[in-house]
Amino acid sequence: MKKMGLTLIYLWLVSLCSCQQELIEYEKGDVKVHIEQGEQWLHDFPLFLGINKKNPPQIAIWLEDTQGNYLSTVYVTHKIATQSWQASGGNRRKEALPHWCYSRGIKYDDGLYLPTKKEPLTDGISGATPHGSFDIKLSPTTALKKFVVTIEINHSTDFNEAFPKLAKEGETNYSGGKE
């Protein structure tokens, strides 16, 4: 019995250690981008029959030169990078990260500026959608002396007074979103 108690304590201690985040080390020249979870981080995404699911936002982080020209995507959430939306009914969620999509300037066969299931972004720049605050480490090449880190954070179907659900395509407050 005593041996079983010690084993349980040992397993509990091991589980505590295994849940800690990996320590990120920074060197001279590295840039730390810290995204802080705010009050509205989780959004009620409508599923059906008035049932909602709490969803974190879609996020894109990219570099631009000092004139505002797109250079490279550093990080983008997995769902938009691979079009792996749940229960979307084929809706590609063009309203999710419109600034990043148009900044990249890559137009796909269907006329939209966001990745497709057939042409997803590479795994190296996409990652799971963070459910809270997180850090990104940038290690710019020596050739890149000055740049702007641009971040877009948005919720699909987050209709509000500025971008109402009933706005029609062509109107200035149309978000492109559909439930």
PLM segments and residue spans:
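Sec-dependent N-terminal signal peptides
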Residues: M4-V14
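Bacterial Sec-dependent signal peptides at the C-terminal "C-region" and cleavage site
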Residues: L13-I24
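Flexible, solvent-exposed loop/hinge segments and secondary-structure transition points
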Residues: L23-G29, K53
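Exposed beta-strand and adjacent loop surfaces of beta-rich binding modules
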Residues: D30, P56-A60, K146-V148
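Short amphipathic, basic-aromatic surface patches that mediate peripheral association
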Residues: K32-K54, K79, F159
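Structured domain cores in non-transmembrane regions
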Residues: K53, E64-L166
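Short beta-strand elements
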Residues: P164-E179
